[in-house]
Amino acid sequence: IYLKSYIHGFFIFSMLINPVDLLLWTFRRNENDVVKLYDALSPIMEVSTGGDMLNFGFWDETTLHPVDAQKRLCEMMGDMAQISSAEIIADIGSGILGPAKIWNSQYPSLQISSVNVNFSQLASVEPSNISKLNSTARMLPFSNSSLDRVIALESAQHFKPIGDFFSESNRVLKDDGILALAIPTATENSNLSNLGILKF
């Protein structure tokens, strides 16, 4: 299958994706399948949106561009997770750190650890004051009761079994800590053209 991104009147990117791989991604068996999926699709998603986030975002009638929807979702997650009152957070399944960069710019004193099973995504990001940890969501690399917030922004749907992630989040969160999740959904009346980065 050839995928092309159409931005500002130009075809920017063309890539061959094996249809068998596409089918196998639908029936992910383990974390390596998710890594392969994002290794193949991340460049397309970045070029298609012009941004550094890999989420669908939050769309409404006023949303005009995928990057606007993505930024809006990050800000909403930050508000819902109450990161303004947090000191130490972990962004699990962090991709290429787009959301963490937004939160870091809004809250410079916030200590952010980005946890991702995909080493190549972490390695592709320029060094910053955001900690990058290559680890699975099933065994979080934090001590007991050490985090104020655990955030999984459109990543928890990949954590298999998700119960392990919930147990680990409970272990690493302080007693008053918050686990915040955003999982992509579509309503029956969703317009497929608004899927932005994944409308192929």
Predicted segments — roles?
Residues 163-178:
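A short glycine-rich, Lys/Arg-flanked "PGG" loop and its adjoining helix->strand segment in the class I
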Residues 88-139:
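Class I SAM-dependent methyltransferase SAM/SAH-binding core
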Residues 64-85:
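Conserved alpha-helix/loop element of class I SAM-dependent methyltransferases that forms part
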Residues 138-150:
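A short acidic, Gly/Pro-enriched loop at the edge of an enzyme's catalytic core
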Residues 149-161:
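A short SAM/SAH-binding and catalytic strip from SAM-dependent methyltransferases
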Residues 178-200:
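Conserved class I S-adenosyl-L-methionine
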Residues 13-47:
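N-terminal auxiliary segments of SAM/dcSAM-dependent transferases
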